[in-house]
Amino acid sequence: SLIDYHLSTQESFKNLMAHSLDTVRYAAYNTFYSSEAISLRNATDISPTQAAKYLRTLHALDSTNPFIHSIYLLNKSSNTVYTTNAGSSSFDQFDDQSAFSPNNHLLKLRQLPNQVWVYTLQFTGIRDTDASMVVNIDTYLFNRSLFRDTDATEFIYVPEQDTYFSSTGNAYLPIETLN
């Protein structure tokens, strides 16, 4: 029946989305626990040369996944944030400090200061409750890979409501509900 088809399609979409996010999440998890990222997170005195060497690990993750917009890594002892898109800066000068605030949602859609919508994945150490690595996934690229059969250019999936929204321009969402 049509209802069974709709439920099956919806379940397939959820599985595809979960698999796509898991691919990024597992690669980021491995990066988070790599010796280079651990050194970058925990070093009390790190030279620019060492930092550049360790940053290659973050750039490797960024370059192998087309959905990743940016990666931030926080060294709390030196109060430094290292990024793949804007170099490094002190945490106090960092323009996206809220990215390191605890996030209790599976997916949190938020807007970066330069108008890029992202899904944010946060990683913390075992004993640490504050996020120390953030992976921002470009929603447009990610959702475009899932919704290939539509002319829409903007998508939002709200997992708590199991609802998808799309738009064909810069108009306010929701324009069309996809489920």
How would you name each of these model-derived features?
Residues G169-N179:
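Extracellular/periplasmic juxtamembrane segments that couple receptor/chemosensory ectodomains to their
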